[in-house]
C-alpha cells in the first residue's frame, strides 16, 4: 500500500501534536488540522506538516480537510459537540474515500 497523506485532527494538542511528530519522523506526509493559527500550528508547519484550519462543527471545513488523504487520526476532546463532530468527520471521511481512521478515545 502506498504511503499517502495522513490527516491528524487536534494536531495542536498534546496527543495530536505527538502523533504529527511521530508520523513525520517516519517519513509520512501529514496534514494537520488546527482550529486557528498560533505558535503551535506554526511549529507544525516548521516540522514539515501541511497545516489546514477548520472547525469540527463545520461539515464543509471537515470535507475540505479530508480531501486527498489516505488515512486519518481522529482526536477530539470529550466536550460538548463530540457527537456532532464525530458524525461530521465520519461522513466526510466516507465521502472522500479515506481508507482507515484511528479514533483516539
Residue map of PLM features:
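Conserved glycine-rich Rossmann-like NAD(P)H-binding loop of the short-chain dehydrogenase/reductase
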Residues: 28-36, 74
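NAD(P)-cofactor binding segment of oxidoreductase domains
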Residues: 52, 59-61, 67-101
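SDR active-site strand-loop-helix element
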Residues: 9, 33, 101-105
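Short, conserved SAM-binding/catalytic segment
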Residues: 40-50
Amino acid at each position: 500500500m502506498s504511503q499517502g497523506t495522513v490527516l491528524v485532527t487536534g494536531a495542536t494538542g498534546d496527543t495530536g501534536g505527538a502523533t504529527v511528530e511521530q508520523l513525520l519522523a517516519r517519513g509520512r506526509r501529514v496534514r494537520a488540522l488546527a482550529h486557528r493559527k498560533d505558535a503551535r500550528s506554526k511549529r507544525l508547519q516548521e516540522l514539515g506538516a501541511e497545516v489546514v484550519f477548520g472547525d469540527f462543527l463545520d461539515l464543509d471545513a471537515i470535507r475540505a480537510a479530508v480531501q486527498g488523504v489516505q488515512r486519518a487520526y481522529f482526536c477530539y476532546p470529550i466536550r460538548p459537540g463530540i457527537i456532532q463532530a464525530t458524525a461530521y468527520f465520519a461522513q466526510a471521511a466516507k465521502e472522500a474515500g479515506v481508507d482507515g481512521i484511528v479514533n483516539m478515545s
